[in-house]
Regions:
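Long, well-ordered alpha/beta core segments of mature domains
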Residues: 1, 5, 11-13, 99, ...
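N-terminal, motif-rich segments that launch catalysis or mediate targeting to/interaction with membranes
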Residues: 1, 66-72, 174-179, 186
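An N-terminal structural lobe/cap that precedes and organizes the functional/catalytic core
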Residues: 1-35, 54
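Catalytic phosphate/nucleotide-handling subdomain of diverse soluble enzymes
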Residues: 1-17, 128-149, 154-155, 219
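Active-site cavity-forming subdomains of large catalytic enzyme subunits
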Residues: 24-35, 39-130, 134, 149, ...
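Accessory "access/gating" subregions that flank catalytic or transport cores
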Residues: 77, 84-94, 103-113, 122-127, ...
Length: 219
């Protein structure tokens, strides 16, 4: 679903049927090969690998990158080590969605253990992201871990919320989505408009990608 529609419906609903297309080049997708790099760090360095060690292997990668990932690798190549490679003082994309699309591997490696997922996500995600950019990955990693044994989607999201600061913008957004869904469970368009009106604000990403609505696929 992602590649054919990415960035094409910013601020508007894309009505009609979306036909899923098989990817002939799945291995060339950044939300796969970046994860493989960090998984290799766990395999070669060990589960106690530090954020700096994750950054070192990421720095030496040769594949294509964008946004926070690209900014982090440039920083690392210039001698700015992780976690500062993902800090907004050095990476203008620190609030972007990069770690969120890559954090599922952490949850898949920690089935039923969202706290353990959060431990690793906090180390890995700081290579390229910060703040809400980091929290998105922590939340999704924890939800993947919780979903191995929890079948109620609402409870899965609640487990994810426990992984991030309650006062963060990301957590407040998710709580809004849960509350609005409880009010109007059958009207996703109404809830989508609520998200747009409250949360689709200017984002620091210099490319102008408005990421907040994309963070709530369950809305």
């Amino acid at each position: 679903y992602g590649a054919p529609t990415e960035f094409r419906s910013l601020g508007q609903i894309n009505e009609g049927t979306i036909v899923p297309l098989g990817l002939a080049n799945a291995i060339d997708q950044d939300d796969l090969y970046v994860e493989m790099t960090f998984a290799r760090v766990m395999d070669t360095v060990g589960l106690d690998a530090t954020t700096e060690q994750y950054g070192e292997m990421f720095r030496d990668s040769k594949y294509s990158l964008w946004h926070a990932n690209a900014g982090a690798r440039r920083n690392l190549s210039r001698g700015i080590k992780a976690p500062m490679s993902g800090h907004p003082d050095f990476n203008v994309h620190a609030n972007d969605i990069d770690f969120q699309i890559e954090s599922d591997f952490v949850g898949l490696m920690t089935p039923g253990l969202p706290q353990a997922s959060n431990h690793y996500a906090d180390r890995v995600g700081r290579v390229m992201n910060y703040g809400d950019g980091l929290y998105g990955g922590m939340l999704f990693g924890a939800m993947y871990a919780a979903a191995f044994f929890e079948t109620d989607p609402h409870r899965v999201v609640e487990q994810g919320l426990l992984a991030i600061p309650a006062e963060s913008g990301y957590a407040r957004l998710v709580r809004d989505v849960l509350a609005w869904h409880a009010q109007d469970p059958a009207d996703w368009r109404k809830n989508w408009r609520r998200i747009e009106e409250k949360w689709n604000r200017g984002d620091p990403c210099p490319d102008g990608v408005r990421v907040y609505p994309a963070w709530v696929p369950w809305a």
